[in-house]
C-alpha cells in the first residue's frame, strides 16, 4: 500500500514588500561592484508607506547615487503612481551608511592563515563571519530542485509577466503563491494537491473574474496538466479582497524571505540571508558553493538527493567543517563524497569567489524568484561542470 504525504512551499512576487527590500539592497550592491569589484557591502533596506530606509556598512572606492538606484528599482518593479501608497518617484529615501568595522576588516583582509605565515594567495581572505550554510539538490525536477518551490516561483514569474505586459490589466505588483505537492512512498511527486495564490488588484474587479483569470492564465499555464486533477484545490485571493498591498499593506525588510530564496523548506537553512552582501560574506557565497556542490553530485548520479553543510569561523579561510548527507540515496559512501568535495571544490572564501566569479554585478537578478534552480538567468553556481571531476574521483 502506497503512503501519501504532502509537502508545501511558497514564493512571493517582486512586488512583495520584503522582496522590494531585497532588490533594492542587491541593486545597490551591483552598482557598487560595477565600479569597484572589491567593494565590501552589507546593505539593509526597509520599506513602508511612502518611505525607504537604507542602512548598513560599505567600504568602497566607488561613488554611486543610492537615491537614484533605489527609485529606479522601485519603478522597475511597477510601483509608479500614488494609488499604490508607494511610488518610486515620490517616496522619501533615507540613507545611513557607515564603513565596514575595522575589527571585522582585519580578519577578512588578513586571515588567520596569512597571519600564521601561509603564502597561498587564496588563504588571504578570511570568512566575513562565523556561520553555517546549506546547499541542496534533488532529481525530482530538471533543475534538480524540489518541485513545490519551483512551481511556486514559476507562478509568481507568470503573474508578473501578465501584469507587466498588461494582459491582465487590473493586476498590481504584490502577490504570493503556495503549492502543495503529493509524494508517493518513494518520495516522487505524483500530483499537485493545493494551490494558493493571492494577488493584489485594482478595486473595481470582481473576485470571480480574478479567480477565473488566475486559474486559466496563470495556474494552468504553469503547472503541467498531468499534475492537476478534479481533486486539486484552488484558493484564489481567499480573503476576498487584496487592493491594499506592497509596502502600504506591510513593512518590508531585507533578508526576511530566506526560505523562498532557497529550497522552500525542503532543506535546512543556516539562518543567514543573501541580499545586500558581497561575496566575502559566507552567508551568501558559501550557500552558493554548497548548492553548486550538491547540484553536481546529483547531476553525476552519485545521489538522488543530497544536502551539503559548510561552516566557518570569522577571520579563518578554511571551513571548520564540511558535511554531505545523501539521505540513503547515495551510490558511494558519504565519507568518500566528503573527501571528493574537499579535493575538487575550494571552499575558502577567496577560492569560492574565484571558482564562481563572484565579484561581478550579478545579484539583483537573484533577489526575486529564487537564487537556485533558475533557468531564465545564467548563474555560475547552477553549472554542472564538476560532474566529470566527481566521477573521475570515484574511478580511482
Curated annotation (Swiss-Prot):
UniProt-annotated binding residues for K(+): 44
| SUPFAM superfamilies according to UniProt | S-adenosylmethionine synthetase
Keywords associated with the record: ATP-binding, Cytoplasm, Magnesium, Metal-binding, Nucleotide-binding, One-carbon metabolism, Potassium, Transferase
One term of GO molecular function = ATP binding
Recorded hits in PROSITE patterns, A to Z, give: ADOMET_SYNTHASE_1, ADOMET_SYNTHASE_2
Specify which residues bind ATP according to the UniProt entry for this protein: 16, 174-176, 241-242, 250, 256-257, 273, 277
Chain positions covered by the region annotation Flexible loop: 100-110
Indicate what this protein is called per its UniProt record.
Answer: S-adenosylmethionine synthase
Q: Which organism is it from?
A: Pediococcus pentosaceus (strain ATCC 25745 / CCUG 21536 / LMG 10740 / 183-1w)
This chain is encoded by the gene named metK
